[in-house]
Amino acid sequence: MTQKWLFSTNHKDIGTLYFMFGAWAGMVGTSMSMIIRAELGQPGTMINDDQLYNVIITAHAFVMIFFMVMPIMIGGFGNWLVPLMIGAPDMAFPRMNNMSFWLLPPSLTLLLMSSVVDNGAGTGWTVYPPLASVIAHSGASVDLAIFSLHLAGVSSILGAINFITTAINMRSNNMTLDQTPLFVWSVAITALLLLLSLPVLAGAITMLLTDRNLNTSFFDPAGGGDPILYQHLFWFFGHPEVYILILPGFGIISHIVCQESGKIESFGTIGMIYAMLSIGLMGFIVWAHHMFTVGMDVDTRAYFTSATMIIAVPTGIKVFSWMATLYGTKFKFNPPLLWALGFIFLFTMGGLTGLVLANSSLDIVLHDTYYVVAHFHYVLSMGAVFAIMGGIIQWYPLFTGLTMNSKWLKIQFTIMFIGVNLTFFPQHFLGLAGMPRRYSDYPDAYTSWNVISSIGSTISITGIIMFILIMWESMIKQRNVFIWTNMSSSTEWLQNNPPAEHSYSELPLINL
């Protein structure tokens, strides 16, 4: 057991470890979000401490981003599926793969420690100085959070090197780049983004660390520094990061849509690849749209507004290509397809509010209100999370050799769909009415929408608990898969069920 799970170099075992870690972190992060919604469920205070409230907000963001979405999407699905889809016996660097995973539990431990020592890191996930400086946050909390980010960053960089090498070098002999499955492309592009953006974050937080402990003044105007420099460095990482969170989801949805529509390939495969590449590369040149309120030149604001809007073009190409793939199909509303349709609809909604926020003049008013919270939760809670749910249901029979109860899954989808929309749709109204983020209390005028939002969060968590029960039921009933009933949309379905410990011991010859 120790050999298998602690020292594993098998991509399937490491993928499973990532899934279990992500599920655990997801439960931690969801618990935090429930505390936030309980606090905001009525006017007046529940926690009685704004610092603690902001610590929970900060930890919720970090846990969900670095320890739930990224490990599940890149580590879980990436490790399991990339080698199977390209006909590789394993990842390019199996031992580095193992190290990538085992850097995450210590990283999460450091993050949770930062919440419980001293007063906690109540900086928001952006960790802006001067709030993150030693004057405003004395004690070890922010330092622990910085070390946590360093570990998570090293883990992601090692993983990125591994995925890029695997996708380039380990493909089947005659599999050309345009025949490479879209999910493999999405993970490779994600890895490229990680490789280019994380070193900048590492630089920024290292400078913050020395500002706090070694008396430097990179971000302190008293010593000739500039806090805006930190914002530029952070968002140069932060914006690609949000595309890192959603790109693997694009790949997952492409596969689900292709398989459920019963077509031989996705509509406009090459266009899909170019769209992902453009989204990834353009993600690096729009970072300052997070900073419209810091007093930038009007020409600078005009550039970042228009560049941000142009990203909507490749995103639109992807959305319409998914719809074109589904065109003419006689739908059987299987659970994975429901999640994919939910993803397409709600991700588009989130994209539209993003287009609103791209306008620098409007963003001056909407910045730091709940409109922004609603926007990014639409693309994360209903984009990334819906893609994860759809992907788990789609490939669960491949990973385990078992089947989940389809009827229950449809009910669970409905509950969760209602829950997340009820949680986040009212937040648009709160934002337009001017309710600011990161405050634990609010004027009575905002009560009704907050009550509805908190009810929605309770419905959502019911849906998540139901999903865990459905998975548990499939495991205790042990309903084995005898044959894949769906048309194989890519090579991972050619495995046994569940796949043998080692796949492709003899390399496959792929004729497409």
Curated annotation (Swiss-Prot):
Heme a3 binds at residue 375. Ca(2+) binds at residues 39, 44. Binds 2 heme A groups non-covalently per subunit. Binds a copper B center. It is found in: Mitochondrion inner membrane. It is a multi-pass membrane protein. It is an enzyme of class 7 (translocase). One of its GO terms (biological process) is mitochondrial electron transport, cytochrome c to oxygen. GO terms for cellular component: mitochondrial inner membrane; respiratory chain complex IV. O2 binds at residue 243. One of its GO terms (molecular function) is metal ion binding. CDD domains: Cyt_c_Oxidase_I (cd01663). Component of the cytochrome c oxidase, the last enzyme in the mitochondrial electron transport chain which drives oxidative phosphorylation. The respiratory chain contains 3 multisubunit complexes succinate dehydrogenase (complex II, CII), ubiquinol-cytochrome c oxidoreductase (cytochrome b-c1 complex, complex III, CIII) and cytochrome c oxidase (complex IV, CIV), that cooperate to transfer electrons derived from NADH and succinate to molecular oxygen, creating an electrochemical gradient over the inner membrane that drives transmembrane transport and the ATP synthase. Belongs to the heme-copper respiratory oxidase family. PANTHER family: CYTOCHROME C OXIDASE SUBUNIT 1. This is Cytochrome c oxidase subunit 1. It comes from Locusta migratoria. The gene is COI.
